[in-house]
């Protein structure tokens, strides 16, 4: 993206025609992003100065950066002294730049001495990470965007790319236009816009992907469609998996998944016998209590057929945020260390300790996202530091999340937007820079690293996230409990490039080796990793030689069982509730929600239901319904949709407490879609099951309705709306 500006004001954006990821194309969100930077908007939304309050019932008062960090570090030092370093938790974001991520990872795991740092990428990508590592040996997507145009079969699972990855979806449309024989298979409970373009749509029941993939592999085995030579030469463990999948007959797949046997056979045939099959998959696989098994079972299909390590083929996980990949590279998850090292590996811990000038880094596993907030809700974690993410909207089971935010003794929110829901729970607000103001790097789904450059100076007193991390480290170093380690560690980086250089050196000899890549080279063009010292360019696709980063050099088949969803539907809660993206909104809408034209596609929240369910509940479009789970209840308009099967319900994930009111079962106010989602997570990846919750749906007969409209000055409208939202929570439905 190219940002246009006049002085300190962003005035426009356009796609970069030379960038190999998008070739100048922008989605609706990207093309309108500059509108969220208009002065009349930012005056109402941006956090511009540090703010502090003594009690959460008090109003915030402006303070200086020095005093703000003194307040924070004094409390952190006190808590660590009394309760140990694991009483502190940091929750960061896939929208940080790689350099920001690196500093906070080093700060928390090195200086503070806890592995309690996790990222909202846990909500979107950790199952993909675990699946790749379980089967291929490393968290490294083996394919690239170019492979879309080279494939003979595209298998799209758990991804509505038309909405979630619209520029990539344009590539799919172009590939089909250039090669009408290209077969497109979409496995998704909903008939999305992506599924509507498919040659074959597999409308499986939520959570049954492992059974589907096992059933496809059984069909391949029975018909001789597996690549025995590839299996023999480049893999291990196939016999154990083969025994598992032989029980997954077409009849059983039909029973569990709801897929007709003919569709199963067709999908298996196209996948296996095509010259090159590329899988594209996203949150439908990842956001599951079986997320790791889903990912690994799909990778198994590629290994069994040899559709990996060649043009147009491979299992290609699509990332959910701009720099989810960069966070994985620096070890920004609670179970990882820098450069794809494993926290559980003592050799890896020693390598990172040497890099950071320490005797050791802590070995105790850190709390992952859901675990961290559960620990805070139980009083185990006393301090929560939240950067560039909005857990008071985006985390599942908001009852638990809000209890955590209320019980923590100190909540620091490092944020660019004062309108984010989590700000209301903070003791200390720290203003951070946002897009257009930041310098550093990001990595996309195809391992391509891109330089990010600032177009305008920081707004107000906002600081870069990496600077906040360094200043925090320097303030902590004044306390005796941190001083010995601080004297051994380097937190004196003068710019993002200095951080990048240390991160780059940490990758030497690793699967993502970027020792051959510098800021100077990134000024010329983005590059894919690995790009080791001496290389002139990065690597397009991985494993072309059939050698994998495992102890044996072979990829692994794992005998995984199909396990149903964590919360099965039953008579009291008969509907399967699913969440996902809208085309024109982004995450919690702190930016896109300020742009009026982006509400043109979907103007208000609704729960989508099958026509049969609408009829049985005596509902018409727009009628209000209670959607209730074991955690709480919300009220929303019902909308008929033929995209869903009976007894399924869908709502967009973006609608927070500013749009949807709700209550928990003790009648305490909750809000947003995640008032009813479950915090159950995959035991391997710890990623929560946001794609299914058991709910009941009942018509809401409210006593009165009011529709009010007003024309408001543009420089006041958002502020007035924000004030109104604090009152909307008192009504059963207000939007």
Positions of PLM-derived features:
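Extended redox/cofactor-interaction regions of prokaryotic respiratory oxidoreductases
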Residues: 102-173, 180-187, 210-214, 302-425, ...
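Long, contiguous, secondary-structure-rich segments that constitute the structural scaffold
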Residues: 459, 465-525, 592-608, 612-735
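Flexible, glycine/charged-enriched surface loops at secondary-structure junctions
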Residues: 83-87, 226-231, 278, 309-316, ...
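Flexible glycine/proline-enriched surface loops and loop-helix/loop-strand junctions
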Residues: 154, 197-198, 247-251, 280-285, ...
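N-terminal export/assembly segments and adjacent metallocofactor-ligating motifs
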Residues: 1-225, 233-234, 241, 247, ...
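Conserved short loop/turn motifs at secondary-structure junctions
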Residues: 89-97, 256-259, 282-289, 321, ...
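Short beta-alpha connecting loops at secondary-structure transitions
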Residues: 196-204, 431-433, 437, 447-459, ...
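N-terminal leader/propeptide and maturation segments of large enzyme subunits in energy/redox metabolism
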Residues: 55-62, 223-261, 338-351, 356-360, ...
């Amino acid at each position: 993206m190219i940002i246009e500006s006049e002085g300190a004001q962003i005035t426009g954006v356009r796609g970069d025609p030379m960038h190999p990821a998008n070739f100048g194309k922008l989605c609706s969100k990207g093309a309108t992003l500059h509108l969220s930077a208009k002065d009349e908007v930012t005056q109402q939304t941006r956090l511009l100065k540090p703010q502090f309050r003594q009690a959460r019932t008090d109003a915030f008062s402006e303070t200086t950066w020095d005093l703000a960090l003194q307040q924070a570090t004094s409390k952190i030092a006190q808590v660590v002294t009394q309760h140990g370093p694991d009483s502190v938790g940091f929750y960061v974001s896939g929208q940080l730049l790689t350099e920001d991520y690196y500093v906070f990872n080093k700060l928390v795991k090195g200086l503070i001495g806890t592995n309690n740092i996790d990222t909202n990428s846990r909500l979107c990508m950790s199952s993909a990470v675990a699946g790749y590592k379980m089967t291929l040996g490393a968290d490294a997507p083996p394919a690239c965007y170019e492979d879309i145009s080279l494939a003979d079969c595209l298998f799209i699972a758990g991804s509505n790319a038309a909405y979630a990855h619209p520029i990539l979806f344009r590539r799919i449309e172009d590939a089909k236009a250039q090669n009408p024989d290209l077969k497109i298979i979409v496995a998704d409970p909903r008939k999305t816009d992506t599924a509507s373009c498919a040659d074959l749509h597999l409308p499986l029941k939520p959570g049954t992907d492992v059974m589907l993939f096992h059933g496809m592999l059984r069909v391949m085995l029975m018909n001789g469609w597996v690549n025995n030579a590839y299996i023999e030469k480049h893999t291990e463990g196939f016999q154990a998996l083969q025994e598992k999948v032989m029980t997954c007959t077409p009849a059983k797949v039909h029973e569990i998944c709801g897929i007709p046997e003919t569709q199963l056979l067709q999908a298996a045939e196209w996948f296996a016998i095509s010259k090159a099959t590329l899988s594209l998959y996203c949150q439908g696989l990842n956001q599951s209590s079986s997320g790791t098994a889903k990912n690994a079972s799909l990778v198994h299909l590629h290994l069994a057929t040899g559709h990996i390590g060649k043009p147009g083929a491979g299992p290609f996980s699509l990332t959910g945020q701009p720099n989810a990949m960069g966070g994985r590279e620096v070890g920004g998850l609670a179970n990882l260390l820098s450069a794809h090292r494993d926290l559980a590996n003592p050799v890896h811990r020693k390598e990172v300790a040497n890099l950071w000038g320490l005797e050791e880094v802590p070995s105790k596993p850190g709390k992952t996202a859901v675990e961290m907030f559960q620990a805070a809700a139980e009083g185990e974690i006393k301090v929560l530091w939240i950067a560039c993410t909005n857990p008071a909207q985006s985390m599942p089971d908001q009852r638990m999340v809000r209890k955590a935010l209320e019980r923590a003794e100190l909540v620091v929110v490092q944020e660019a937007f004062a309108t984010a829901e989590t700000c209301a729970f903070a003791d200390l607000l720290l203003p951070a820079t946002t897009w257009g103001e930041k310098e550093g790097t990001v990595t996309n789904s195809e391992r391509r690293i891109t330089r990010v450059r600032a177009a305008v100076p920081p707004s107000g007193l906002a600081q870069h996230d990496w600077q906040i991390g360094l200043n925090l480290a320097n303030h902590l170093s004044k306390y005796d409990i941190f001083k010995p380690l601080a004297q051994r560690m380097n937190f004196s980086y003068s710019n993002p490039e200095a951080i990048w250089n240390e991160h780059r050196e940490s990758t030497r000899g690793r699967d993502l080796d970027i020792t051959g890549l510098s800021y100077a080279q990134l000024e010329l063009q983005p590059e894919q990793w690995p790009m080791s010292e001496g290389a002139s360019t990065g690597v397009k696709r991985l494993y072309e030689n059939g050698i994998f980063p495992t102890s044996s050099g072979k990829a692994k088949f794992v005998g995984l069982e199909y396990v149903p969803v964590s919360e099965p539907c039953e008579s009291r809660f008969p509907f399967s509730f699913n969440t996902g993206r809208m085309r024109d909104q982004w995450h919690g809408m702190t930016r896109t929600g300020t742009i009026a034209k982006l509400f043109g596609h979907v103007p208000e929240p609704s729960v989508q239901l099958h026509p049969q369910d609408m009829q049985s509940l005596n509902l018409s479009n727009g009628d209000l319904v209670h959607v209730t789970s074991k955690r709480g209840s919300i009220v929303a308009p019902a909308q008929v949709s033929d995209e869903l099967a009976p007894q399924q319900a869908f709502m967009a994930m973006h609608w927070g407490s500013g749009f949807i009111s709700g209550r928990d079962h003790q009648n305490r106010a909750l809000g947003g879609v995640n008032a009813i989602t479950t915090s159950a997570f995959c035991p391997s990846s710890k990623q929560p099951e946001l794609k299914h919750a058991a709910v009941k749906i009942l018509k809401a007969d409210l006593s009165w309705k009011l529709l009010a409209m007003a024309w408001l000055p543009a420089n006041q409208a958002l502020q007035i709306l924000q004030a109104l939202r604090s009152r909307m929570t008192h009504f059963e439905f207000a939007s």
